[in-house]
């Protein structure tokens, strides 16, 4: 009869030293595998990010070019839509903001045009064309002093650009002079009105049979005539940007032998 005994455990005959060596080798292999996997994952993530950025840049470039073609066809709103999509992909592209500003000026959205041009100058502060576009947007908004400064910055960055001298800056300086003329005109009218209402000749006590009354009445008549003459004249800007005084028929209708020389605004 065969004797009964406990079954030996697996590995019972393996020495403890062999087991410990095996466990150490196994742990080292696991650590090496984890390390290799970690490096691989970082590389994969970095590569995916690079590919994503490349895809965004390529798509943004395509949208930019499509928008430029639409703008050349006067399909300005469609062009803006393309560029807005491109901005979402490449928000630090100053050219997109500058192009948007040009189209917004054309559409009369001058406040948005100024904002877009300002963003372009912040992203690329040494790009003279961005400053030129900002100056034109500011002119359209009526900010003549700011426009003069923007054109001066553009000229400082690119002094050889003749259109900046001959068109943009000269026009802005003329507008500034015209604004000064308008302010002086308004000041003269206000002063004439004040002297008419607060005439010092009316504050004295006169003998109605004396010559002082006649002199006071004559002075009042002169003030009245001066005030009316000032009201009959308006300062307008001709096609060459020159400010001129012209007679007006009513309160708001200037008259001239050549109405065609008058302009309301310069197309920038």
From Swiss-Prot:
SUPFAM superfamilies the UniProt entry points to: TPR-like (SSF48452)
Recorded superkingdom: Eukaryota
TPR repeat start-end pairs: 60-93, 94-127, 128-161
Keyword Repeat: yes
InterPro entries given in the database record: TPR-containing, TPR-like_helical_dom_sf, TPR_rpt
Ranges in a coiled coil: none
Keywords: Repeat, TPR repeat
Repeat in keyword set: yes
Region (Disordered): 14-34, 249-268
Protein name (database record): Tetratricopeptide repeat protein 33
Gene name of the encoded protein: ttc33
